[in-house]
Regions:
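Predominantly flavin-linked oxidoreductase catalytic cores and closely associated redox partners
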Residues: 119-256
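FAD/FMN-dependent oxidoreductases across multiple families
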Residues: 237-331
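Glycine-rich FAD pyrophosphate-binding loop
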Residues: 14, 28-50
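Conserved phosphate-binding and hydrolysis motifs of nucleotide-dependent enzymes
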Residues: 15-20, 168, 291
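A conserved beta-strand/loop capping segment in the N-terminal third of enzymes
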Residues: 63-114
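Beta1/beta-strand and adjacent pyrophosphate-binding region of the FAD-binding site
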Residues: 4-19
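C-terminal helical "tail/cap" subdomain of flavin- and related membrane-associated enzymes
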Residues: 320-453
């Protein structure tokens, strides 16, 4: 076999999870020679802290990748959803005689990551190099022309027209390229646990918007459901004092929530106390960023996996020809940057604002209340929540007028905030709730631990 330093590549991709593997497949199918680097050697390596939710915006990418049959064979669950609000449940349904609602899948990363990585490894034109990581970039005349790569046999230099950072929210490639990171505080924290055989009405995803707290229960493959609580940080002292008890109390208090006492909890309670949102310019001369490396959303919305797949597809469409030397790479990267910003910038802007830990604003109250009262508005909400339409289309004048008409038809006393646990007061933040006698005894993570992949 040719020594690694003597191999010729058009593109070097750092990171072989969802974004990196998808980009490698899509680029190679367009004639690009790809080195796909993964720092971990374990073929089963996967991201731990994740919603495991593929938004419907990801379905066209999964279809192009040819992964739909493999996902369904692996037990992926089609992700229908309903959302609880102070006005009742939003339950999107297909229009009479209309097409079914767009969907994608819920599937655990322990299943998805090895599946898509294996698919990439079998794709002609892709060299999957596990146990290898980028330790620096090669630069000439102000542009990146390759990467320094560390592996089991030492460090080598790989020259390439394009280096792609698919290496997560703390992206070393972005740091080596000097790409600025914009960081936005998140005034909520989150904890997750996985349950087997958890009863859920209709077996579909449930989300609770409790203003400002949020929670969700998402069924996945192999009969496993992830239950997440995402409270405002004023509840943090109670979780620090007694994670097990606070998590359990929070879930039990959810209106129409899952009966976790009737299920088997199969994991520890894991999560993060501080998960800021990040945005970066997704390209520089000779460098592109995809997935969380370009934009880290709020886990509250479950958008990371879908955006990873979309950004991989946009990159391949924009740069494949230029990456093989048959076009202007700078122009191609500019086209990718514009597509990325046009597709995700508006969604991220709204997510940054909602991450302030606030209740719904007037526009959100208008649209959520109308969606809870009207099937057509619920379908409109579904398209937006699926990231199939952007904020401008979601809040277009016609939609706002329709929502107003719906709400005028349901005039009555102003809806109170959602009933849940009372907000903490200074007298109650020092101690947490007592554990319920039926609470499982599996250990929980340290309350100060932030898990990383």
């Amino acid at each position: 076999m040719t020594a690694l330093e003597d191999r010729v590549y058009d593109v070097v991709i750092s990171g072989a999870s969802i974004a990196g593997s998808a980009a490698a497949i899509l680029l190679a199918r367009r004639g690009v020679r790809v080195a796909l680097l993964e720092r971990r050697s374990d073929p089963a390596a996967h991201k731990v802290l994740c919603t495991h939710y593929l938004q419907p915006c990801s379905y066209p990418v999964l279809e192009e990748l040819g992964l739909i049959p493999a996902l369904e064979a692996a037990g992926a669950v089609r992700n229908e959803a309903r959302w609880y609000t102070r006005w009742g449940w939003i339950e999107p349904k297909a229009a009479p005689s209309g097409p079914e609602l767009p969907y994608s899948y819920n599937i655990r990363r322990s299943t998805l990551d090895p599946l898509i990585r294996s698919h990439a490894a079998k794709t002609p034109g892709v060299d999957l190099l596990t146990g290898h990581s980028v330790t620096g970039l090669l630069q000439e005349a102000g542009r990146t022309v390759g990467a320094r790569v560390s592996g089991p046999d030492g460090e080598v230099e790989l020259r390439a027209r394009l280096v792609v950072g698919a290496d997560g929210k703390d992206s070393p490639v972005a740091r080596f390229a000097g790409i600025e990171t914009r960081t936005y505080d998140n005034e909520r924290f989150s904890y997750f646990a996985h349950f087997r055989n958890l009863p859920l009405r209709d077996g579909i995803t449930h989300s609770w918007f409790l203003e400002p707290d949020v929670a969700y229960a998402m069924p996945n493959d192999d009969g496993v459901t992830v239950v997440a609580v995402i409270p405002g940080k004023d509840r943090l002292p109670a979780f620090r004092a007694n994670l097990e008890g606070a998590y359990t109390e929070f879930v039990r208090a959810l209106p129409g929530g899952p009966d976790i006492d009737a299920a088997e909890r199969i994991t520890k309670i894991t999560g993060t106390l501080n998960y800021p949102l990040h945005s970066r310019r997704p390209g520089a001369p000779g460098v592109a960023l995809i997935g969380d490396a370009a934009l880290t959303g709020d886990p509250l919305w479950g958008v990371g996996c879908g955006w990873a797949l979309q950004s991989a597809q946009w990159l391949a469409e924009a740069t494949a020809t230029a990456a093989t030397g048959r076009g202007d790479l700078d122009q191609a990267l500019t086209a990718y940057i514009r597509r990325h910003r046009r597709g995700l910038g508006g969604h991220q802007h709204l997510a940054v604002d909602y991450a302030k830990g606030r209740p719904f604003n007037p526009f959100e109250r208008l649209m959520f209340s109308a969606a809870a009262r009207d099937e057509a508005m619920a379908r409109h909400m579904h398209l937006f929540a699926s990231r199939l339409i952007g904020p401008l289309r979601f809040l277009n004048p016609v939609a706002l007028a329709q929502a107003s008409v719906v709400n005028l038809r349901h005039r009555g006393p102003r809806a109170a905030p959602p009933a849940h646990l009372p907000r903490p007061t200074p007298a109650t933040t020092a101690t947490g709730p007592a554990p319920h006698p039926r609470t499982a005894t599996l250990p929980a993570t340290s309350q100060n631990e932030r898990l990383t992949p």
